Design a protein with these regions (language model features):
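Amphipathic alpha-helical interface elements
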Residues: 1-130
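Conserved helicase ATPase motor motifs in RecA-like P-loop NTPase domains
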Residues: 383, 512-538
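Conserved RecA-like ASCE ATPase "motif II neighborhood" in helicase/translocase motors
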Residues: 456-483, 493-513
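A short helix-turn-beta junction within AAA+ P-loop NTPase domains corresponding to the substrate/partner-engaging
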Residues: 543-553
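Conserved small/polar residues in nucleotide/adenosyl-binding loops
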Residues: 554-561
Length: 561
């Protein structure tokens, strides 16, 4: 606190150290061994997250402290505004720690930002603090003993509750949203990349420009919290609010008005006009992760203003600059028409996929479900009936008609992914070429995708790591894939039991299902599942099968042949 105004660089560095110390205290309290390999602060946080001990909001604060500490050490970061924002967030972090690992009945006093004292009386301060240390040490011993009587599960539940009751200011929320936007490919810094400080759209940069002025009379004198630009194209408006605000109402009462009120001098940045709207996409958020229980007060709410039929919906993460440009290129009505008018001759070709009637029927059922607007689709086909070839044919038609831009083929074990890769490479489908010669396919060994990628084969485990325990400073965009095809995901936990302890991602079957569902629901995509034996959690996510082909039918058809 004493450094916040006099030496912001030192303040940022020491706040980061506080975050490190707090994590080490949790390890000691929970009797958890620190990682034997790559024992870094970031990896220790990931380990505690896997144990369910670090809620999302706490993780966001710890990330901000760690990132800014590194910037302070290596880049000389010394923003007083950042130091003040992080100081108040760190106070909230300390309160959370006290509520979980100290006194469960603790009621924290309001945080008071320290004044810029030019020459403090250090001797008096030291004497006062030494007296406090003696008194507090006795209290700490008592409350720590009380907290240690609780189980780790109880503390995890308490930690989640305490983090959700934490109220961040709008400035703190904006700071965390800056960090989130940067993870998804946007340049964002509320304190420096502001309209009032001369920041304007530039070719080759993806800028989230803060406090963008509009002619709207709503909100803060018509200033949008962020305007999103891909190069010099205005593609989105973002409003950031405190946790207590109903987020969808912000889209109706503010975001839409900002999208209508783009100033005449900024018309050069607009792409088109959709009715009264001059911006295609709007977002509203309070920085809190999406929770179904408090749906309207969590998540990132998004609305595509290009059609009045679109309704606001909650997203699990942000859309990247590339993702928004791909959204602009979509024409679902035209793609559905192309899909319906594409014949099945290639899929029946004996020199190609050579699909049988029931496999064509499965694809037809899947396509009709998509045209009808279903977001989740389940196909049930008995073992040995050629699910992988059916999937290949279905994916080919969806991409060929441009109904979907990029497909995630998600498997529960490496062997299934390798099997799919082999089929995609070997089976001829068009002009005697296999799918991987027609479209860009990324295999199991490739984590990153690019604009040209059409199919990405990945395991559930790899996506859990990328989404829940990311190792770098980037996150997958929620629109990286617009179709997810899941093959036999119900067996994933059985395979994971065979992993070594250091590789374990799931504590038990319920934890596997929870994380599996998180991966599935993270992306704003149509989701398909193909399975021989639908598990309960599979039908809970995907619904009842739109197509069912049993062993009995397969045997009967084979006999007829």
């Amino acid at each position: 606190e004493s450094y916040v105004c006099s030496d912001a660089n030192a303040c940022l560095y020491k706040l980061g150290m506080f975050g490190e110390r707090l994590i080490l205290e949790i390890f000691a309290f929970e009797h958890i061994k620190e990682p034997t390999i790559d024992n870094t602060h970031a990896n220790r946080i990931r380990l505690l997250k896997r144990e369910g001990l670090i809620p999302k909001k706490i993780d966001d604060i710890l990330y901000a402290l760690r990132k800014t500490r590194n910037d302070a050490v290596h880049a000389g970061a010394d923003s007083v505004e950042d130091a003040k924002t992080l100081l108040s967030m760190t106070y909230n972090l300390a309160v959370w720690f006290m509520e979980v690992y100290g006194d469960w009945g603790y009621i924290a006093p309001a945080f008071v930002m320290p004044e810029n004292v030019v020459q403090p009386d250090y001797e008096s301060i030291i004497k006062e603090q030494e007296e406090k240390i003696v008194a507090l040490s006795k209290q700490v011993e008592a409350v720590s003993t009380a907290a240690s009587t609780k189980t780790s599960k109880e503390r995890a539940e308490k930690g989640e509750t305490a983090s959700e009751s934490m109220e961040l200011s709008e400035a703190e929320t904006r700071y965390l949203i800056d960090e989130q936007l940067r993870k998804f490919g946007w340049e964002a810094d509320t304190n420096t990349l502001r309209y009032s400080k001369g920041t304007r759209p530039q070719k080759g940069r993806n800028l989230a420009i803060a406090e963008w002025p509009t002619d709207s009379a709503v909100g803060k004198n018509g200033y949008a919290d962020y305007a999103l630009f891909v190069g010099v194209k205005l593609v989105g408006i973002v409003e950031a609010k405190k946790a207590a605000i109903d987020i969808p109402s912000v889209i109706d009462h503010q975001c839409k008005e900002y999208a209508k009120g783009i100033k005449d001098e900024h018309q050069e940045y607009t792409i088109n006009q959709w009715g009264a709207y001059k911006v295609p996409f709007v977002f509203a958020t309070n920085g809190r992760k999406y929770l179904k229980q408090i749906e309207t007060k969590s998540g990132i709410w998004y609305l595509d203003l290009r059609s009045g039929a679109n309704a606001p919906k909650a997203l699990q993460g942000w859309i990247s600059p590339q993702g928004l440009m791909e959204q602009l290129e979509k024409d679902i009505a035209a793609a559905n028409s192309a899909l319906q008018n594409t014949p099945f001759d290639l899929l029946r070709d004996p020199d190609g996929l050579n699909l049988r009637k029931y496999q064509i029927n499965a694809i037809e059922a899947a396509e009709q479900a998509v045209i009808d607007g279903k977001q989740t689709v389940l196909l049930s086909m008995a073992t040995g009936t050629g699910k992988t070839r059916t999937i290949l044919g279905m994916i080919y038609r969806f991409i060929k008609s441009d109904r979907f831009k990029r497909v995630l083929f998600l498997v529960d074990r490496t062997a299934l992914g390798e099997q799919a890769e082999d089929v995609f490479k070997e089976v001829k489908i068009e002009e005697l070429m296999p799918l991987d010669s027609i479209y860009n396919i990324k295999g199991l060994d490739e984590k990153e995708i690019d604009r040209e990628t059409k199919i990405h084969i990945a395991t559930v485990q790899s996506l859990v790591k990328r989404i829940l325990y990311p190792e770098g400073d980037t996150m997958p965009s929620v629109t990286d894939y617009d179709l997810i095809v899941v093959d036999e995901a119900h067996r994933g936990y059985i395979l994971d039991k065979e992993m070594s302890e250091t590789e374990m991602l799931y504590r038990n079957q319920d934890d596997y299902i929870s994380k599996y569902r998180t991966v599935i629901e993270y992306f704003d995509a149509v989701k398909f599942a193909l399975t021989a034996t639908p598990a309960l959690h599979t039908t809970e996510i995907f619904g009842k099968p739109v197509f069912n082909y049993s062993c009995l039918l397969y045997t009967s058809d084979a006999a007829d042949d």
